[in-house]
Amino acid sequence: MISAGDLRKGTTFEQDGQVYTVVDFLHVKPGKGAAFVRTKLRNVITGSVTDTTFNPSAKLQEAVIERKEMQYLYSDGELYYFMDQETFEQIPLEYAKVQEAIKFLKENMFAIIKFYKGEAFSVEAPNFVELQVTHTEPGVKGNTATNVLKPATLETGAVVSVPIFVNQGETIRVDTRSGEYMERV
């Protein structure tokens, strides 16, 4: 059992026969009245998102989630295929289950697939990935008085903000949890 006050992004729990993962949370302590936890939850099976409020002392049943490292193979336009490195079994996943991670995954990269009762429900990209910048505007000399950022499109199609000294064709390291530029490689 976990208390609602301990909910964090990514926590998975069971409630009313359904399994939810926390997409976003906010601990609220109003000046008057009792504290509460406002959450945005995603049903791991249906993919639907709901807003729910909990009392911080409420107890929730923690869900048993299996995490397995698998290799991203390819996409056929509708489904994304991942392969288990031990059994070489391939599993197809629809976009709704990979949308958070796919913008940072190239073919043959490894990712963590989360399973609940044998059914895959989420993909987690590695914390840091190295990707090539395919398009960005050139930096202008003299724009260095402050920390100036510009948008850059990566080889996977993701758009991140990078410093003005990063040029097209360079490889950069990106934190996939926040989508932020870390450094040039």
Curated annotation (Swiss-Prot):
Gene Ontology molecular function: translation elongation factor activity
Protein's pathway: Protein biosynthesis; polypeptide chain elongation
PROSITE patterns, per database record: EFP (PS01275)
Compartment list: Cytoplasm
SUPFAM superfamilies for the chain: Nucleic acid-binding proteins (SSF50249), Translation proteins SH3-like domain (SSF50104)
Top-level lineage group: Bacteria
Any one of the GO BP annotations: peptide biosynthetic process
GO CC annotation, single: cytoplasm
Keywords per UniProt: Cytoplasm, Elongation factor, Protein biosynthesis
Keyword Cytoplasm: yes
Chief site of localization: cytoplasm
Function: Involved in peptide bond synthesis. Stimulates efficient translation and peptide-bond synthesis on native or reconstituted 70S ribosomes in vitro. Probably functions indirectly by altering the affinity of the ribosome for aminoacyl-tRNA, thus increasing their reactivity as acceptors for peptidyl transferase.
Similarity comment text for this entry: Belongs to the elongation factor P family.
Protein name: Elongation factor P
Native species: Clostridium kluyveri (strain ATCC 8527 / DSM 555 / NBRC 12016 / NCIMB 10680 / K1)
